[in-house]
């Protein structure tokens, strides 16, 4: 009787292990493709996108949208740094393929054929100055990107445009922002 009870418990344990492994395999089969081809986590490192994003901000990157639509001006993207693809950068799109970006006296101008206009960057605080005068004509597969913290950003003003094939995706959502949570201005009255 004892042998049958041990055998029954062993069979039950083995079945539970197999059931657990099957659940893990099914979960992996669902999660892996989503993680690889649709959404990707990204943790901000550095001050180049302040005050929009801070070091430690945990973001979700949408990798799917740009397979169907082109990136647009103002999108915040994550991309492989063109000179070292192992590094991932986060910046805002300023210039689109075929345009010329002209930075003169702290102002950003966009040339589209015979049209030229000053870029109105409403997402930047009013005290932000765009330094490093530069003019760059973009090819049909290139984007001009800059960080929102213009004084502390290494971007297209320094190392040139981002090729389309280096773009990983656009920022979809901020999941967690330690700086914004822990820097809340708390006051207590007596």
Regions found by a protein language model. Name each.
Residues 2-18, 22, 33, 37, ...:
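Soluble "head" domains of membrane/secretory-pathway proteins
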């Amino acid at each position: 009787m004892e042998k049958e009870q041990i055998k029954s418990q062993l069979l039950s344990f083995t079945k539970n292990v197999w059931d657990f492994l099957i659940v893990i395999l099914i979960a992996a089969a669902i999660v892996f493709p989503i993680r690889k081809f649709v959404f990707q986590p990204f943790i901000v490192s550095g001050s180049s996108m302040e005050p929009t994003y801070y070091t430690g901000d945990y973001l979700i990157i949408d990798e799917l949208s740009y397979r169907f639509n082109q990136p647009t001006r103002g999108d915040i993207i994550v991309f492989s740094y063109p000179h070292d693809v192992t590094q991932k950068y986060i910046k805002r799109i300023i210039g689109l393929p075929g345009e010329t970006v002209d930075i003169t006296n702290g102002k950003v101008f966009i040339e589209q054929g015979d049209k030229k206009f000053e870029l109105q960057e409403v997402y930047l605080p009013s005290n932000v100055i765009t330094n490093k005068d530069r003019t760059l004509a973009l090819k049909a597969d290139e984007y001009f990107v800059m960080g929102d913290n213009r004084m502390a950003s290494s971007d297209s003003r320094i190392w040139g445009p981002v090729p389309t094939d280096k773009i990983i995706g656009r920022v979809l959502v901020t999941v967690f922002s330690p700086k914004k949570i822990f820097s809340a201005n708390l006051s207590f009255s007596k």
